[in-house]
Every structure is written in structure tokens, then in C-alpha cells.
Amino acid sequence: MTYKKQLELCIPRVSEKISRKFIFDTFVKLNIGYIDRIIETPLRNDSHYKRIIIRIKWDNTQNLANEIQKQLEDLKNHLNVVYDMPWFWQIYANQPQRNI
């Protein structure tokens, strides 16, 4: 496997009841690379939800990993990941905040 660290994923809004392990297991099933870290941040305006940042070392030998990265390179695009039919998460490329 060839791992390449490039793009972080963001799930902007997830119920607080969904565990980090559930998110981890869902992304492991996609077989897109090594899940390096999952960061949970509570949403400021709604304490029942959180934002998820997923750091991945991408396995670029997998077609799905390459397709996801290609789709998300344009930061306006998103993907839907179904975690429990019909429920899904909208996945975006993470845009790190800049300190000004």
C-alpha cells in the first residue's frame, strides 16, 4: 500500500450521540487509507451536534480513495457517505483556519 497524506475530511454536522468509534468503523469499511485521527468539536450554536475532522493517510492504490480526493479537490464539492440507510453524512474537504 502506498500512503499519501494530502486531504483532511470534514463532516460539518453530526449528532452528538454518534460515537467516534462508529465514525471510525464507517470510514475503515470504505478502505480508503489509514485513519490517522478523528477530531470532534462541539458546534457553538447547537450543543446537540458536533463537527468532525478526519485525518487520513490516503491509500492511493485504491480507486475509491483517488476518486474521493479528485471529487473534493474543488472545495465547493461534497460527497455523501451513507452510514445507515437512508442516513448519510455530507463530507467536505477540510479547510484549515488561518491565523491572521
Model-derived features: positions:
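Canonical RRM/RBD RNA-binding surface and closely related RRM-like beta-sheet modules
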Residues: 2-51, 55-68, 72-75
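Low-complexity RS/RG/RGG-rich segments used by eukaryotic RNA-binding proteins and nuclear co-regulators
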Residues: 71-100
